């Protein structure tokens, strides 16, 4: 097993401020950049006071967005990272099969999890990855293969909080909304995408936790939100954490016996106070997860929305709603609340929100690129029919 050496890294990685920050620093997503550039140029040149010109820009933007999903990419894949479901002997055996077949191919280096290094022979073509490596040097990997269920895909999303290499998920778990590649045909599937790849950019949310500094000080939260929409630390609040989620962020009452009071703001405008066991804010990808159980609707991943679903709401008039993902949501725990609430990010990293604290949710500039067949729509609908067992007698 060869240990990773920093000297192997590219000497000119992408900076945070570069527009390419939305794409991994690799040849795969660089080929999508011209389409995005065209969209940005049209947006800047369009005279917004002319309705017809604005209509044309909107139409062309939709056309370019569609091209991103159906544009074939000619990848140059030399480095593949494997993420597998832990504690499963069947998955472990299949992982070994994957690794030894991949390193038999020309110019392919495979990265496996460091905890599994004793399972493989030492060779320069097998290296191992750590969480820190994935976080700091995501541009090193040209492709990620996941072996497991949807939980393994979510774990991969947590590994890459910023730029994400293309993800190719193989189904070896209990749920399969995201894992539409058949593990029995892995050789054919991998060889096909090495020649031509289609990538779908799934929306992720950036979630920022803001903690109130002085618990005894009463502040005007409406005024505060309108003045600090993009701020980190403010006079009254401290920024404590930022996480990117693929499925959803959930605010719930935790161990408390009473319902939570949750104030909901849309772009700093007060919408309503939710009296419920909690609130689920989901991406279109997450519409098949907790959001579905909370009464939210299924949503195709191409639709640009934030799905807000109350969990066991006290009022029958409080129903799930869809909000454009161009907006920012603020979830505020009232300053006079009698109890705290808890938040979780894709089911992990539970954090307590005390009265006066709030959470900001907005679309992340780092999407989650999944490899798919030529017809992404068919992939999604087939996964829905298969997993929800529709049309089965």
Curated annotation (Swiss-Prot):
Its EC number is 2.7.1.-. GO terms for molecular function: NAD+ kinase activity; NADH kinase activity. InterPro entries: ATP-NAD_kinase_N, ATP-NAD_kinase_PpnK-typ_C, NAD/diacylglycerol_kinase_sf, NADK. GO terms for cellular component: cytosol; nucleus. Its main location: cytoplasm. GO terms for biological process: NAD metabolic process; NADP biosynthetic process. It is found in: Cytoplasm; Nucleus. Gene3D superfamilies: Probable inorganic polyphosphate/atp-NAD kinase, domain 1 (3.40.50.10330), Probable inorganic polyphosphate/atp-NAD kinase, domain 2 (2.60.200.30). Keywords: Cytoplasm, Kinase, NAD, NADP, Nucleus, Transferase. It is an enzyme of class 2 (transferase). HAMAP family: NAD_kinase. Belongs to the NAD kinase family. This is Uncharacterized kinase C3H5.11. The lineage of its organism: Eukaryota, Fungi, Dikarya, Ascomycota, Taphrinomycotina.
């Amino acid at each position: 097993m060869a240990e990773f050496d920093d000297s192997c890294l590219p000497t000119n990685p992408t900076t945070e401020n570069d527009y390419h920050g939305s794409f991994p620093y690799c040849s795969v997503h660089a080929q999508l950049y011209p389409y995005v550039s065209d969209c940005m140029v049209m947006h800047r040149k369009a005279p917004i006071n002319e309705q017809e010109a604005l209509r044309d820009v909107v139409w062309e933007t939709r056309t370019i967005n569609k091209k991103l999903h159906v544009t074939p990419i000619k990848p140059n894949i030399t480095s593949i990272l494997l993420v597998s479901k832990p504690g499963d002997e069947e998955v472990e055996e299949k992982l070994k099969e994957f690794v030894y077949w991949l390193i038999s191919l020309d110019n392919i280096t495979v990265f496996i999890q460091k905890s599994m290094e004793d399972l493989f022979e030492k060779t320069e073509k097998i290296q191992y990855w750590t969480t820190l490596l994935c976080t700091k040097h995501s541009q090193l990997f040209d492709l990620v293969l996941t072996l497991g269920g949807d939980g393994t895909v979510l774990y991969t999303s947590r590994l890459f909080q910023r730029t994400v290499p293309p993800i190719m998920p193989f189904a070896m778990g209990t749920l399969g909304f995201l894992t539409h590649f058949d593990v029995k045909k892995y050789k054919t599937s991998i060889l096909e995408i090495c020649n031509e790849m289609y990538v779908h950019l799934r929306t992720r949310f950036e979630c920022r936790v803001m903690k109130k500094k002085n618990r005894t000080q009463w502040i005007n939260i409406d005024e505060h939100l309108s003045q600090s929409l993009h701020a980190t630390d403010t006079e009254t609040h401290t920024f404590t954490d930022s996480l990117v989620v693929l499925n959803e962020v959930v605010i719930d009452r935790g161990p408390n016996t009473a319902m939570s009071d949750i104030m909901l703001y849309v772009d700093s405008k007060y919408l309503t106070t939710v009296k419920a066991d909690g609130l689920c804010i989901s991406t279109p990808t997450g519409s098949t997860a907790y959001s579905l159980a909370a009464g939210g609707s299924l949503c195709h991943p191409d639709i640009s929305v934030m799905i807000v679903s109350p969990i066991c709401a006290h009022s029958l008039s409080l129903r799930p709603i869809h909000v454009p993902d161009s907006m920012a949501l603020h979830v505020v725990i009232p300053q006079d609340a009698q109890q705290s609430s808890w938040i979780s990010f894709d089911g992990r990293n539970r954090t307590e929100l005390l009265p006066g604290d709030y959470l900001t949710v907005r679309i992340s500039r780092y999407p989650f690129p999944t490899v798919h067949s030529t017809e992404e729509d068919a992939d999604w609908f087939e996964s829905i029919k298969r997993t929800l067992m529709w049309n089965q007698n």
